[in-house]
Amino acid sequence: MILMKDIVRDGDPVLRQVAQKLTFPLSDHYRKLADDMMEYLVNSQDPKIAAKHQLRAGVGLAAPQVGEGVSMAALLVPDDKGEIIFKEVYVNPEIISESVRKTCLSEGEGCLSVDKVIDGYVPRPNKVTVHYWTVDGEEKTIRLKGYPAIVSGHEIDHLNGHLFYDRINKENPFALDEDTIVIY
């Protein structure tokens, strides 16, 4: 089981490297990694389990965040009522198209690998099309909007060596375009 002590923190070089693409069929090691990352997200969203193991809640976890420099990320995205609206493990994901219109979270973003609060809006495309493979090697392309699009962008950024605060406007952290959709 992945615990907070296993999460790589900001400053570790693996978080700033472009993750290596995986080949299929996935080895048992990478299949287990996918299961373990999803298990962390499920456990972290269960208040009793999270408290018992001192887990910070997460909606996404990329392989580099657990020290594995490979292109894989687990996502478990709830709606504002806590119901799961998107659950997937991406292998070798790419955002192949995105909307011009941006969206962001009203409270900004956080990250399991970043221990401090970094204030500011993190504008991301409101709609994205993600091309990826499943753990079983099935090729997929999906369109996402709103919160699932934000989480997908955050995790895919990890796979490209970027952290959420790289997207915050340095001069005015709370500046937004007029038509940016602010959610939650």
From Swiss-Prot:
Homology family: Belongs to the polypeptide deformylase family.
Under the heading Gene3D superfamilies, the entry gives: Peptide deformylase
Q: Name one GO biological process term.
A: translation
Positions that bind Fe cation: 111, 154, 158
Q: Where is the active site?
A: 155
Q: Which residues cross the membrane?
A: none
Q: Which cofactor does it need?
A: Fe(2+)
Enzyme Commission code(s) on record:
3.5.1.88
Q: Which reaction does it catalyse?
A: N-terminal N-formyl-L-methionyl-[peptide] + H2O = N-terminal L-methionyl-[peptide] + formate
User: What note does UniProt attach to the cofactor annotation?
Assistant: Binds 1 Fe(2+) ion.
One GO MF term attached to the UniProt entry: metal ion binding
- Could you tell me what this protein is called? Peptide deformylase
Entry's InterPro entries? Peptide_deformylase, Peptide_deformylase_sf
Q: What does this protein do?
A: Removes the formyl group from the N-terminal Met of newly synthesized proteins. Requires at least a dipeptide for an efficient rate of reaction. N-terminal L-methionine is a prerequisite for activity but the enzyme has broad specificity at other positions.
